[in-house]
Amino acid sequence: MAYTKLIVAAAALAAMGSVSAADESAALPPAFVWKPVPGLVWKTVGSARIENGLLIAELDKVGDAYAQAEIDLSAYDRKPYEIAATVRAENIVDARQAYLGYRFAVNYLDMSMGGNRTWPSGRRIVGDYGPGETHFIDRTEKVRRKAFIQVGICSARGRVTCDLSTLRIREAQPLVPKRNVGYKVKYPGRVKNLPRMRGVMLGNVKGDAWDNLQAWGANLVRYQFAILGTGPVTNFEAYAEGFRANTMKELDNITATLDAAKAHGMMVVLDAHYACGGSCSKELGDPIDWSGDWRVFHDKRFAKLFAWSWQKIAERCKGRTDVVYGYDLMNEAHHTSPAAEGCDLVGLQEKIARAIRMIDPDTPIIVESMYCDPGWFRSLSAIGLDNVIYQVHLYYPHDYTHQGILTSASDVYCWPDPKMGWDKDFLLKSLKPVIDFQKEHEAKMFVGEFSAIAWAPNAEGYIRDCIRIFEELGWDWTYHAYREFPGWSVEHEATSRGKGTENFRPSKDNPRKRVLLSGLRGELAPGGVTGKGRGR
C-alpha cells in the first residue's frame, strides 16, 4: 500500500510539473531549452530518504533533512543558469532566517572570487506549496566548481517531497535586454570639473556630526532616506496615501541635510534607500517566483508612485546643483524574475530619470546595476541619457567583509589571504566588469558603499586597498557608514565578535579610522595629494 502511494505521489508531482519540450524547443534558442541532469549520485542528510526516485524529507522538530548531489556546472561558466524540479512543500515553519527552511538551491566554489564557497539564495517558501514546479536561478556570471544541489529542509520543520526524475537545467534567459550598446555619456563642464569627491554614508545625523566630518576632510555624503507607506501593500490606496504623506515630510529632512552640507563645504548624494512597496513575498499573495524581488519591478502602480516621489524631490531640489551631487534612484535594487513590461531594472530607472528630467534637467542621475554588484555590470546597459553617474558597491569577498554577520561568529577570514587569492589585485579583478562598462560608455563612476566589519582581521588594510583602487581609477566614493551600526563605524572598536552593542566601545582613535581619514584627506591618492579632501 505504501509503495502504491509513493508511485501515485510521484506521478502526480511529475504531471503537475510537466512541460512541453516540443513547444519550448520550437520557441527558444537551444541554450534556453530544458535539459535533463543525468548521473547525479544523491546522499541523504538527517531523516531524508529516497524511495523510487521520490525524495521525502519530513521533520516534526526543527532540524535538517535533505538530499545532496554534486552537479557539474562547467557548461555554464560565466553564464546564468536555472534548475527546476517538481516539488511539494507542506507546513514549512520555524525557519529562523529567510534562507533557511525549504531548500532547493545550489552552492559552489566561486573560482572567479578566489575559490570561496558561495551560497546563492533559493526561493523562500513558508507554509504550503504545490505540488508544482520550483526553480533555482543563479543569474551571476561566475566560474563554478565543486557544486552541490540540495533539496529538502534546512533548520526548520515540515514536509518536502520532490520527484528527482523531473530535475532539469538550462541557461537562464536575460532578465534585462541589452540596449544602448556603445552609448557615450556626456557631462556638463560643472560635473566633469568637480574635484575628487570623498566621504561617508549617513542618515539623519545630529549634534557635532557635520563639524566632525568637516574636520575629517570629507566633501561628500550619501544621505540615505526611507519613504514608506502606511498599512499593508495589499491595500494599495491606503499604502499610497501614507507614502505620499511621508514623501512630503521627508522633503524637509532633505532640505535640512542639503543646508547643513552646504554650510560645511560638502555635496550630497540623495539615496532612496528602501523600495516603494518593499519586497514581494508569498505571504503577501505574490507569485512565489517574485519572492524577494522589489515590488516596483512587478507592479506598475508602485513604480508610478515611486517615480512621483522622485519628482517631488526634484521639485524641492531643483537649482541646487552646488550641493546636490546626484539623485541616487535605487539602493541595491533587484529582481530575479522577468519584470512587468517596461519596468525591468534598466527600463524603470530610465523612466524615473526621464520623469525627473522633466522637472530638473541639470542635476545628475545616479543609476546602478542589479544589487549594485560589480559582476552585474557585465549585463548592465546604459540608460541612454547624458549626465548620468553609474554606481557600484564593493563588499568583495563577502565572506570577509561580512564575517560574523551572515555567517557564524566563529568563522574567521583574513585580509589579505594568499591561500584564497584575496588581495588588492583580487579587488581590482573583481571590478573589471565595472571598468569595462566605464570604458565602453565613457561613464563617470561612483562607489556608494564599501566597508569591512570592525572585528575583521586587518579591516584597515582592506579599507586602504579599496580606497587606493578608487583613487587610481579616479572614482568618487563614500564609506559605509557614519554613525550608524557600530560594526561599520570607525568611531567604535569591537571588543568581541558579535552584533550586540555590548560587543563595541567608543573609540577616538583606531587603525580603521586612521586609514579612512587618510583617504578623506587624499593621502591615498596616487602621489599622496592632501588638503581637505579636495585633491585631484
Residue locations for each model-derived region?
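Bacterial N-terminal signal peptides that target proteins for export
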Residues: 1-7
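Bacterial N-terminal signal peptides
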Residues: 7-15
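Extracellular and organelle-lumenal recognition/adhesion modules and their flexible linkers in secreted
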Residues: 14-16, 22-184
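Short beta-strand segments enriched in hydrophobic/aromatic residues
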Residues: 85-89, 106-108, 140, 153-155, ...
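Aromatic-rich peripheral "rim/lid" segments of glycoside hydrolase catalytic domains that contact
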Residues: 177-182, 457-536
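Active-site mouth of glycoside hydrolases
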Residues: 182-364, 369-377, 387, 486, ...
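Short low-complexity, flexible loop/linker segments enriched in glycine and/or proline
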Residues: 236-239, 283-287, 381, 461-463, ...
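Extracellular glycoside hydrolase catalytic/binding regions
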Residues: 308-311, 315-325, 332-475, 495-506
